[in-house]
A protein has these predicted regions:
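Helix-loop-helix hairpin linking two adjacent transmembrane segments in secondary transporters
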Residues: 1-41
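Short extramembrane helix-to-coil loop segments that connect adjacent transmembrane helices in Major
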Residues: 8-9, 15-18, 99-110, 233-237
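C-terminal membrane-cytosol helix-exit motif in multi-pass small-molecule transporters
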Residues: 30-52, 254-262
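Flexible cytoplasmic inter-helical loops of multi-pass small-molecule transporters
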Residues: 41-63, 269-276
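Extracytoplasmic gate region of multi-pass secondary transporters
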Residues: 71-129, 183-187, 191, 218-226
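A late C-terminal transmembrane helix in Major Facilitator Superfamily
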Residues: 122, 197-234
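Helix-to-loop junctions at the C-terminal end of transmembrane segments
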Residues: 125-141, 230-231
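C-terminal transmembrane helical hairpin of 12-TM major facilitator-type secondary transporters
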Residues: 142-190, 247
């Protein structure tokens, strides 16, 4: 798409009008998502089993927020794990300038190779993480989704630090392929893990809150962190060091609180199981 965009000056679209080639690339990439969204209308509402959030049966936004803050020691470090994933994923928006400044790749070449790597690793890793979570859960490992997420965090840290520092761009891209596996591990189990510790009456609202938190963390921390380190520490040509520092800087604290999150998660899961809820 990027290669094609260089060959035209503008594209005329109904209703929207004339858009620039780089803008039209977003229409092309996003359109398949609209088709996929139609299939969600065919999904049925699953049966509900969990108790409501409050004794009085409250299930509005304020009940959800009260529940979250009343259980902040569970939810906040739990969500932090998945915020880390988006911070790193969004910071990799600097991948094109990283490869251009460090190894001389043009953005179009980076985009093509990166797309191949993502297609080769992402779908398999997401589905494998889901399968592994189900398998471990069926064997009685109640904190299986969080364990898999923390494994993903460890993979992200190691590969995220190593990839920008290697001397060869193809080796770097291969390591970023492994990094994609880590990101997929964390991403795949987030909502599953959350729903296991959430009452019925606020599930949808808490999932929305979860997505809001991880999206804002990714947008407001990931790219700005790279930019700040470039501007004030490593300089424009030192982008590889910024890209290597951010995964470690934000990832190590997440791993350190991992055992605590696992313990609190098991306690919450056991609480719901004690209520006889599946």
């Amino acid at each position: 798409v990027l290669q094609w965009a260089k060959t035209v000056e503008g594209v005329d679209l109904p209703v929207v009008g004339t858009v620039k080639p780089w803008q039209f690339t977003f229409f092309i990439v996003g359109f398949p998502g609209l088709i996929l969204a139609l299939f969600f209308f065919l999904l049925r509402e699953p049966p509900r089993h969990r108790p409501t959030v409050a004794p009085e049966g409250g299930d509005n936004l304020w009940d959800m927020l009260r529940h979250v803050f009343a259980n902040a020691s569970l939810y906040l470090p739990f969500i932090a794990i998945f915020c880390y994933m988006t911070i790193i994923a969004y910071s990799q928006g600097f991948g094109a300038p990283l490869f251009q400044r460090t190894w001389g790749w043009e953005p179009a070449k980076y985009a093509t190779v990166n797309a191949i790597v993502l297609l080769a690793t992402g779908p398999f890793a997401v589905n494998f993480a889901g399968w592994l979570s189900d398998r471990w859960t069926s064997r009685g490992i109640s904190d299986a989704p969080v364990r898999i997420a923390l494994i993903g965090v460890a993979i992200i840290i190691v590969t995220g630090v190593a990839a920008p520092l290697v001397p060869n761009p193809y080796l770097a891209m291969a390591i970023y392929g492994a990094n994609t596996v880590g990101i997929a591990f964390v991403s795949a189990v987030g909502v599953t893990a959350l729903l296991n510790i959430t009452p019925d009456g606020i599930k949808a609202q808490l999932v929305a809150f979860y997505y809001m938190c991880i999206s804002m963390a990714g947008l407001f921390i990931g790219p700005p962190a790279i930019g700040l380190f470039n501007d004030f520490v490593f300089g424009t040509d030192g982008i590889r060091y910024s890209m290597a520092l951010v995964p470690a800087l934000f990832g190590v604290p997440v791993l350190l609180v991992g055992p605590y999150v696992l313990r609190r998660y098991r306690e919450a899961n056991a609480h719901y199981e004690s209520l006889g809820q599946g």
